[in-house]
C-alpha cells in the first residue's frame, strides 16, 4: 500500500502505534498553527476538540501510548507556538522585557493546555462549543491587557504577610 515497503516503514517507525502517534501529532500541530491568530484561535481550538471527540478512540490510543510528560510537552509546545504568534500579532511595537513576554506566553498557553487536559481527563464530557466559548470569554481582551500592563507598569509587588517568606 502507498508504495512503502515493510523494511522502509520499520526503518522510520518501530511499530504502527508510532506511526499513528506521528500522524496525530502532525495533524494537531498543523491545525493549531492554521488558526494561530487572535481572531481565529478559539474557532481552531473548538474544531480541534470536535475532531478529537469524533476520533475519540484514536485520540485516547495515542494519548495513552505516550507518557504523561510526553503528551503534556507535546501540547505545551504546540499551543505555545500558537500563543507566541498571537502575542506577536497583538504586541506590535509594545516594549516588553523578554522574560515578561515569555511569562505572558506561558501563562496563556498553560491555561489553554490545562483546559484541554481537564476535558480529556473527564472523558470529553464537556461540550466542545460551550467549553471553548467559556475559555474565550475569559481570555477575550486579557492578552492585550496583560501586554499593556507589563509594558506600562512594573508588575505589582507581592504583598507579603508577617511570618511568610
Over which residues does each language-model region extend?
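An amphipathic alpha-helix adjacent to DNA-recognition modules
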Residues: 3-6, 10-36, 46, 53
Amino acid at each position: 500500500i502507498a508504495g512503502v515497503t515493510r523494511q522502509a516503514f520499520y526503518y522510520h517507525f518501530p511499530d504502527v502505534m508510532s506511526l499513528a502517534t506521528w500522524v496525530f501529532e502532525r495533524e494537531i500541530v498543523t491545525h493549531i498553527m492554521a488558526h494561530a491568530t487572535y481572531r481565529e484561535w478559539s474557532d481552531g481550538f473548538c474544531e480541534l476538540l470536535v475532531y478529537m471527540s469524533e476520533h475519540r478512540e484514536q485520540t485516547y490510543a495515542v494519548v495513552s501510548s505516550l507518557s504523561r510528560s510526553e503528551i503534556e510537552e507535546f501540547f505545551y509546545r504546540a499551543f505555545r507556538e500558537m500563543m507566541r504568534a498571537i502575542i506577536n500579532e497583538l504586541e506590535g511595537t509594545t516594549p516588553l522585557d523578554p522574560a515578561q513576554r515569555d511569562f505572558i506566553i506561558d501563562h496563556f498557553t498553560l491555561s489553554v493546555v490545562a483546559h484541554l487536559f481537564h476535558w480529556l481527563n473527564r472523558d470529553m464530557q464537556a461540550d466542545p462549543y460551550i467549553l471553548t466559548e467559556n475559555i474565550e470569554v475569559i481570555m477575550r481582551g486579557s492578552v492585550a491587557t496583560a501586554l499593556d500592563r507589563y509594558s506600562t507598569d512594573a508588575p505589582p509587588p507581592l504583598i507579603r504577610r508577617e511570618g511568610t517568606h
